[in-house]
């Protein structure tokens, strides 16, 4: 005959707090059995049994009276038998202190040490709860937590009248919609810390260091309605003089490098709309200013706070400069019947061979006027002077691009640095192809 497992006796917390003896084969609350826990009064755990009562001669009159009250309650529990965890009606008012614990095995602790006939006071019943459970900014979490507390109270006390005494019912619930357990959204609590909306990124060098660069964020105010190397830029959203007001005050960088470069390019784009795009003097002046600003950016500690994105931005500026030089120095639209933008989209080899075969000479006479004081230089003298000036500028631009490429290689290799390397290498190859074309 197999040995029977020990039966789960009465709950340890209730019996041990009241110092009652185990009812042996008649469990009282069956809390241990419902929670699938082993009762401390089991045969396998003899050390968890309650302590014996003191000697009869050491008892006082008060302790004798208290023992009689406990025996009366024990008899009432035995009369209930296996009626579950619902206490008898005459004992529901006697517990005066209900402690809520985090341990599911100790959800409620009945303290019979304080017997009073007054109403139950739940002022300290929820002392272990965190305030965020009561004033939670998420309505679903409040509804879930409040409904769970209500179910716990109803299952433990056997009555719904105690819900009105919970602190959550008067602080976090609306009395008109208590059945739906929703919050009053018209007046949120002052203690809630609502998330602040993210401010829009303004056009500034510091904002580019935060968000990934793209055409609409880097060039938000450049025209795109004309056919030129600047056609990839977006339309202007504000006047160039208002760029200083768009600076973010949240970051202390104090740098105007990006703003200066893009304002100058915007001014050049406005000039291009009026028919002055093909002038060599304007293009050379813009190239010199941009090259100087690029050198300033490379030596600026504020601009290089996020070096990878800065180098990517500078690479885009240098590529745009090469586009402008190709467009103004190699006017091949009439000779080849194909615009420079279509040729730039082809492969580098076919692009180089097409330029070698079909490009016309530099349009010196039609594009600009060269004056020395009041004397106008024309003909071959003008062509030789402009060729020398343009070659010198392109060599200086090539030196700047070498410095930029060295800075990219020394920076940490990320996706931005790899993209900057690709852009600057392609622009450098196109620049040297242009220099070879000018040399003849």
UniProtKB/Swiss-Prot annotation:
Entry-linked SUPFAM superfamilies: Zn2/Cys6 DNA-binding domain
Bias-annotated ranges (Polar residues): 77-93, 168-183
Subcellular localization: Nucleus
Compositional bias ranges of the Basic and acidic residues kind: 53-76
Gene Ontology annotations for the cellular component aspect, listed alphabetically: nucleus
Applications: Phomoidrides A and B (also known as CP-225,917 and CP-263,114) are potent inhibitors of Ras farnesyltransferase and squalene synthase. CP-225,917 and CP-263,114 inhibit Ras farnesyl transferase from rat brain with IC(50) values of 6 uM and 20 uoM, respectively. CP-225,917 inhibits squalene synthase with an IC(50) value of 43 uM and CP-263,114 with an IC(50) of 160 uM.
UniProt main location, coarse: nucleus
Annotated segments matching region Disordered: 44-93, 168-196
Keywords: DNA-binding, Metal-binding, Nucleus, Transcription, Transcription regulation, Zinc
MF terms (GO), sorted A to Z: DNA binding; DNA-binding transcription factor activity, RNA polymerase II-specific; zinc ion binding
Nucleotide-binding as UniProt keyword: no
Residue ranges flagged as DNA-binding region: 12-39
Pfam families xref list: Zn_clus (PF00172)
The keyword ATP-binding is annotated on this UniProt entry: no
Protein origin, superkingdom: Eukaryota
Transmembrane segments: none
Role summary: Transcription factor; part of the gene cluster that mediates the biosynthesis of the antihypercholesterolemic agents phomoidrides which are dimeric anhydrides. Probably regulates the expression of the genes from the cluster.
Name under which the protein is recorded: Transcription factor phiO
Organism: Fungal sp. (strain ATCC 74256)
Gene: phiO
């Amino acid at each position: 005959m197999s040995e029977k497992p020990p039966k789960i006796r009465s709950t340890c917390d209730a019996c041990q707090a009241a110092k009652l003896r185990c009812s042996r084969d008649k469990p009282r609350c069956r809390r241990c059995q419902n929670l699938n826990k082993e009762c401390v009064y089991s045969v396998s755990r003899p050390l968890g049994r309650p302590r014996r009562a003191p000697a009869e001669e050491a008892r006082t009159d008060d302790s004798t009276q208290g023992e009689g009250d406990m025996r009366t309650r024990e008899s009432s529990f035995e009369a209930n038998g296996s009626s579950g965890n619902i206490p008898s009606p005459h004992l529901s008012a006697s517990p005066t202190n209900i402690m809520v614990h985090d341990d599911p095995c100790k959800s409620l602790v009945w303290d019979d040490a304080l017997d009073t006939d007054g109403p139950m006071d739940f002022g300290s019943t929820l002392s272990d709860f965190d305030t965020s459970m009561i004033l939670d900014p998420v309505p679903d979490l409040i509804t879930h937590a409040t409904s769970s507390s209500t179910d716990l109270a109803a299952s433990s006390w056997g009555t719904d009248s105690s819900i009105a005494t919970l602190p959550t019912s008067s602080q976090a619930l609306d009395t008109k919609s208590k059945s739906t357990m929703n919050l009053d959204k018209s007046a949120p609590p002052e203690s809630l810390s609502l998330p602040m909306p993210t401010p829009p990124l303004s056009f500034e060098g510091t904002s580019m260091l935060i968000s990934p660069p793209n055409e609409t964020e880097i060039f938000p105010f450049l025209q795109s309605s004309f056919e030129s190397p600047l056609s990839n830029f977006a339309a202007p959203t504000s006047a160039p003089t208002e760029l200083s007001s768009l600076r973010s005050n949240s970051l202390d960088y104090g740098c105007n490098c990006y703003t200066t470069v893009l304002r100058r390019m915007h001014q050049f784009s406005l000039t291009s709309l009026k028919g002055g795009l093909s002038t060599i003097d304007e293009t050379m002046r813009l190239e010199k200013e941009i090259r100087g600003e690029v050198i300033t950016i490379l030596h600026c500690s504020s601009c290089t706070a996020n070096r990878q994105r800065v180098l990517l931005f500078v690479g885009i500026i240098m590529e745009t400069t090469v586009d402008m030089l190709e467009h103004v120095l190699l006017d091949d639209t009439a000779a080849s019947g194909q615009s420079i933008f279509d040729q730039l989209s082809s492969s580098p080899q076919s692009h180089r061979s097409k330029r070698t075969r079909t490009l016309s000479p530099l349009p010196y006479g039609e594009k600009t006027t060269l004056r020395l004081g009041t004397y106008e230089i024309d003909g071959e003298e003008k062509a030789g002077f402009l060729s020398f000036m343009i070659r010198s500028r392109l060599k200086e631009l090539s030196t700047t691009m070498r410095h930029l490429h060295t800075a990219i290689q020394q920076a940490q290799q990320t996706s931005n640095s790899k993209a900057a390397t690709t852009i600057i290498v392609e622009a450098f190859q196109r620049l040297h192809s242009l220099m070879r074309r000018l040399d003849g």
